[in-house]
Amino acid sequence: MNPVSPRSLTMIGAGLAGCLLAILLSRRGWQITVYERRGDPRIKGYECGRSINLALAERGRHALRQAGAEEVVMAKAVMMRGRMVHPLVGEPQLQRYGRDDSEVIWSIHRAALNVALLDLAEQAGARVHFYRRLHTVDFDAGYARFIDDRDDQPHEIHFQSLIGSDGAGSALRAAMQRKSPLGERTEFLDHSYKELEIPPLPGGGFRIEGNALHIWPRGRYMFIALPNDGGTFTVTLFLPNAGEPSFATTRNGDEAFALFARDFPDALPLIPQLKQHWEEHPPGLLGTLTLDRWHLDGRALLIGDAAHAMVPFHGQGMNCAFEDCVALADQLDAHDDLASAFAAFEAARRDDAGAIQQMALENYLEMRDRVDDPEFLLQRQLEQQLQARWPTRFVPHYTMVTFLRTRYSIALARSEIQREILVEATRGHSDLSRLDWAALETIVHARLEPLDGAH
C-alpha cells in the first residue's frame, strides 16, 4: 500500500484531459499519480477504430498554452479553413469557418496528441501507471484497488482524493454511483459511427484538399474527413442504426462498398481499404451524458467526458474538457480545501457544459441536413454581412464557440437571438439585395450587446 502525500491527487485515466490536468497541477506543486486501464501507447500502439479525429479550437489552445504544451502539439496539427461540402452532383464548395486564416481550426490525431501530453506529464513530475483498471473504491477509507488485466493481479493504494478523467464509460463514475447516486442519464442518438482512413498519395501528400474538413451530407446520414499531418485523412461515416441505409443494412465490407458507390462515389476511390477497415473497426456509439452532480465532497470529482460526454459534432468535446482542466486548477489555487474547490468548479462549469452539449446536437442537424440548403446558405451570407457591419455585436455562433473563449452558455443564448434575426430577415428573399439595412441595424443594436473579445 502506498502512503498518501500532502497536496496529492490520484487521477483515473491517462487520456487527453487526464494528461493535461496532470501537467497543470504537477507544475503547481501537486504530487500527481495517474492510473490508466490500457497499456502505454508509446510502446504498444494506439487503440484503433474508437476515436473520431479531433478539432483543436482556441479554447483548447489556450489550455495548452497554460500548460506549456502548445508548441509541441501544434507541430502535429493541420489547419482547416472551413467545411468542404461534397454534393452528390456537382463540385465541392468551401464554406469558410471565419473571415480569414486567423480564424481556423486545427485537426490533430488523438494518438499523436495523447502521446505528446503523456511525455509532458511525466516530464512535469506526474507518475503514470499503465494496465491499472479501477476495480474497487472505499471512499470513506481512502482505499482503491486496481486490476492488471494481463495477469489479474490486484494493486492497492491509499488516496487523498480521486479525479475521474476516464471518459464516457468512467469506472470512477460507476464507483461514485455505488456510493451515492449521481443522477446519471445518457441519451444515445439513433446513429452510430464507423471510422476509416484515406491514405496519402504514393509520393506523400493529401489526395484531396488538405486544409479543410470535408463533408458529404446526405440528409439522414453523412461522411466526414479530417486531415492528419502525415497526409492521411481520418474519415468517419455517421449512419442510422436502423432503416435504409443503416448499420443494420450495411453489415459487411461488400455492403459498405455498395453504399459508397451509390451515395459517396467521389470518396470511394480515396479509400482503398474500405472493405477491410469496415470489418475491422466496430461501430461507435454517440450519446450525451448528464449528471445531477459531479463530485463527492472532497473525495472524488469527474471532469471532461466522465462528467458531461457529448456528441462530437461541434468538435468541442476535447476543447471543453481542456477548459475543465484549467478551471479546476484555478479553483484548487483559490480554495484551501478540496470540497470547496470541487463544488466551485462544478458551479462554474455546469451551465457551460450543458450549453455545448445542446449546441453539439444542433450542429449535427446543421452538418447533416443544412450545409447544402439554399435557405441556410442565404442566412450564412447575411450572417457574414452583419458581422462585417457590426463586428462586436453580431458575432457568428461558430466564432464565439471556436475562435473566442466566450462562455458556452452565453454563446448559446446569443446564438438563439441571432438565429431569430437571420430567419426573420431572410424570410421570402432569395438574395440580400432588398433587405432593410436600417431596420436590421436597429434590431441588432436593440437585441445584442457588444461581446467581450469580439473585434
Curated annotation (Swiss-Prot):
Catalyzed reaction equations: L-kynurenine + NADPH + O2 + H(+) = 3-hydroxy-L-kynurenine + NADP(+) + H2O
The name this protein goes by in its record: Kynurenine 3-monooxygenase
Cofactor dependency: FAD
GO BP, one annotated term: quinolinate biosynthetic process
Alphabetic keyword roster: FAD, Flavoprotein, Monooxygenase, NADP, Oxidoreductase, Pyridine nucleotide biosynthesis
Highest taxon listed in the record's lineage: Bacteria
Keyword set includes NADP: yes
Entry keyword annotation includes Flavoprotein: yes
Species per Swiss-Prot/TrEMBL record: Xanthomonas oryzae pv. oryzae (strain PXO99A)
Gene Ontology MF, one: kynurenine 3-monooxygenase activity
Metabolic or biological pathway: Cofactor biosynthesis; NAD(+) biosynthesis; quinolinate from L-kynurenine: step 1/3
EC number(s) on file: 1.14.13.9
A Pfam family: FAD_binding_3
Broadest EC class assigned to this enzyme: oxidoreductase
